Design a protein with these regions (language model features):
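Residue-level detector of short, conserved catalytic/binding motifs and their immediate flanks
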Residues: 36, 77, 155
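Gly/Thr-rich phosphate-binding beta-strand-loop-beta motif of the actin/hexokinase/Hsp70
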Residues: 18-43
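Short, conserved, surface-exposed binding loops centered on an aromatic residue
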Residues: 15-18, 29-32, 68-73, 91
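Mg2+-dependent endonuclease catalytic cores in nucleic-acid-processing enzymes, primarily RNase H-like
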Residues: 39, 46-149, 168-169, 174-177
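Acidic, Mg2+-coordinating catalytic module of metal-dependent nucleases/exonucleases
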Residues: 148-169
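ATPase catalytic-site recognition across NTP-hydrolyzing enzymes
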Residues: 1-27
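Active-site-proximal flexible loops/turns
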Residues: 35, 89, 163
Length: 177
């Protein structure tokens, strides 16, 4: 797959998923054009590696379908989701999914990108949607202050889950460069 010039993430490679580390799932909601995504993360804090596997990326999903897919793929594991739709999160939770909204603060996109850039990202070879995003996710401005809001659905899901594990629990124990 061809890589766009100036991609945000250069710290990734395709490799086998290893779920021997802390497991968490990230979710971004879409509907008609943008997909709803669920990404599994296995975080190796000691070696600063995050293993990534897209469980699904689908458009047009109903609340029941999202809940069913989440339960099938995530089981009892925590899913950290986009916080833009609290009613959807509540309905998914009521159907038995262990789901919480991400905490979006001012600057959370940039700090999440910086956090992910500090880790080696190992992408499961079957996660073609994520590979496509990583090859196309670029900065909107030369000053690298805002990414193009496209090619980011799996990436946003990853950011939500990684920030939950690595920032919210450690209260900012990483450095933004």
């Amino acid at each position: 797959m061809e890589k766009q010039e100036g991609v945000i993430f250069t710290n990734w490679r395709v490799g086998q998923f290893n779920d021997n580390y802390e497991t968490i799932f990230g979710q971004d909601f879409g509907f008609s054009v943008d997909p709803t995504t669920l990404v599994k993360l296995s975080i190796d804090k000691g070696n600063k590696r995050i293993f990534l596997k897209v469980m699904y990326a689908k458009t047009g999903m109903s609340t029941t379908q999202i809940a069913d897919y989440n339960i099938r793929y995530a089981g009892p594991h925590l899913v950290v989701s986009d916080s833009a739709e609290p009613r959807l999160i509540k309905e998914i939770k009521m159907k038995g999914c262990n789901i919480v909204p991400t905490v979006k603060r001012s600057g959370s996109i940039l700090s999440g990108i910086a956090l992910l850039q500090d880790y080696d990202l190992i992408v499961d070879p079957d996660s073609m949607e994520l590979i496509k995003e990583l090859n196309n996710y670029t900065w909107a401005t030369k000053g690298q202050t805002k990414p193009v809001p496209k090619w980011d659905h799996c990436i946003d899901a990853i950011r939500y889950a990684a920030q939950y594990v690595l920032v919210n629990r450690t209260k900012g124990a990483y450095t933004i460069r």
